[in-house]
Amino acid sequence: MKKQLQNKATSKFLSVLRSVMVLCCLGLVVVLLPSYISKKQSAPDAGLPAITAKVQLISDGLHSPTSVTFPGNGDVWVTEQTGFIRVIKNGKLLTDPLLDLRSKMIKVNGGYEERGLLSIALHPKFKFNKKFYVFYSAPATAGLDHKGVVAEYQLTAKGTVDPNSGRVILSIDEPEGNHNGGCIQFGHDGYLYISSGDGGGQGDKHGEFGNGQNMNTWLGKILRVNINTKAGYLVPKSNPFVGKIGYKPEIWAYGFRNPYRFSFDKLTGQLFAGDVGQDLWEEVNIIKKGANYGWKIVEGTHCYSPATGCDIKGITMPITEYSHKEGISVIGGYVYNGVQLPALKGKYLFADWIGQVYYLKNTGKAWQRGNITLQNIPPNLKVLAFGEDEAGEVYVLTNADIGPANPKGAIYKMVRN
């Protein structure tokens, strides 16, 4: 999961990895990959100032935290890629997990890995029905790498969860181990939105135009379903492709490579998604009903296949993009609606996996990008995800390792300087 290290396996990046491996084999003391990448400077839009924010450590000792949610009682729930939902109570990370999903999942590699327990979402009426939803990677039949499973669980009256009580909502067949998407969020309409990557592999070599443009697969899409039913799910009649022959009716938007993280603006309901690029470009999109975001015809705003002269008719372009001279894997975040950081009010916060945090400002004519500098945070951390609490404050989920083997993950809250 940790994202698109492997999926955006650029030759330059791989050469760095090979160099690191050689040095390690020689027994030399080296500072790993993050030190190399951290020397790359971001290039925000001219005229936008850098904004500084402090961070407050909420918890460390986590195995690659992939998502966070807030059940309303003061606790914090965190998903670890390895398969646990952990609870932070009164500032302390409890030893016993709320839920252990390892028996349902594939075995997660300790090094670089994109599969695992990837996200959690509370039902809009969680206060009353105590239902929540998870996205995890499960074993698959022969010919597939795994399945991306969305499942429902429910707290008991004692506040516990039976690991065998899960109800599977849907399963996505995954041909390879990367580009899994894996984000789930409820929209203001009460429906569950699910992101799915293109199925993995360099350049989405699944047919002439790839899975992203194939409307008869869930891969490379954002899906929208109604989970308020006793079995499976229902397809909302307002989905854009309902009734169209050869189109999966669950599709809300398409043309994605790996929309690893998306979120809704708490105030407006607008849907933002970061889509991880292939070799050259990272992008952020505003997701609209039925829209085509172009992969693998384009990468960002640039022709990908063919490399020149591609037909961009009908493609919705990103609101921002940046090159691999700056980063390697976009991590979608949230529109800031809290009170701790007035300078960020109404701006979209996101990051790159290598650790640079950004904001987007809507000028009315265009979205402009600026840098966010996080103070009192350890150097060379990888950003895995963001979270948002009930008050609209934003959290940054990080890891000091390249994978989930060691408990070097942490959650930080962005706070006033």
Tell what function each PLM region has.
Residues C24, L28-A46:
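Bacterial Sec-dependent signal peptides at the C-terminal "C-region" and cleavage site
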Residues Q41-D198, R261-F264, G269-G277, E326-G364, ...:
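Acidic, Gly/Ser/Thr-rich repeat motifs that build Ca2+-stabilized beta-propeller blades
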Residues G148-K158, G210-I227, I287-K288, I411-V415:
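Beta-propeller blade signature
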Residues M1-V16:
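N-terminal secretory signal peptides that target proteins for export/translocation
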